[in-house]
Amino acid sequence: MDTLKTYYSKRVQEYESIYHKPERQHDLEHLKQMLRSLSSGQSVLEVACGTGYWTQGMAEAATSIIAVDNVAEVLEVARQKRIDESKVTFVKADAYDLAPLVGSFSMALVAFWWSHIPKEKIPQFLRSLHGPLTHNSLVVLVDNKYVPGSSTPITEWDSSGNTYQTRTLSDGSEYRILKNFPKETELRDSVESYAEDFDYKELDYFWIATYRVAK
């Protein structure tokens, strides 16, 4: 099991504590409302759904959601939430190999996963992500900005330009976690061959990028 997967399996009981930071509540409410609006009437693929924090809100508006994660422990928590099971299916799947998923989707949400992708693996992830999507599908990327005093400090850089944080869980265990904070131009360049109508917005603590899948 890789470090990131181990970390999230161990963090499962405190997974959503990050959403309790007082200074981020306004931004989080904005994101919830935005995702409910964007997912209305959509067939959604949610990548790296974690404990279903974002799934729960979208389920009120979406036609259907396939929510995938590669960590069994967080999926167990997600399945315990009050979510319409006729709309939402949680699936254990690898974000880098979404080919086994059955069906096509009119929207994909990648929330707080892009920052964990090593820069050298972004092309592989994008090939995987776009496999189940169709022309004009909406792709929504949401992730953290680096905000001094609120974000966990960066403690390491590697030769590929990836940045790392040292994260400590409530049991005192420490993990070296890859966490990148891309700029708009880097995101735009990464998805350029797949995207049309690219749009990028920044909130105080988060960024949001959307685009339509090009022909």
Language-model features, listed with the residues they occupy:
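Conserved class I S-adenosyl-L-methionine
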Residues: M1-S39
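Short glycine-centered segments of the SAM/dcSAM-binding site in methyltransferase folds
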Residues: S43, N136-L138
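Class I SAM-dependent methyltransferase SAM/SAH-binding core
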Residues: L45, T51-D97
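Conserved Class I S-adenosyl-L-methionine
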Residues: T51, S173-K215
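A conserved beta-strand element that flanks and buttresses the S-adenosyl-L-methionine
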Residues: L109
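Short catalytic micro-motifs in class I SAM-dependent methyltransferases
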Residues: F112-W113
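A short glycine-rich, Lys/Arg-flanked "PGG" loop and its adjoining helix->strand segment in the class I
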Residues: P123-H135
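C-terminal alpha-helical "lid/dimerization" subdomain adjacent to the S-adenosyl-L-methionine
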Residues: V142-V191
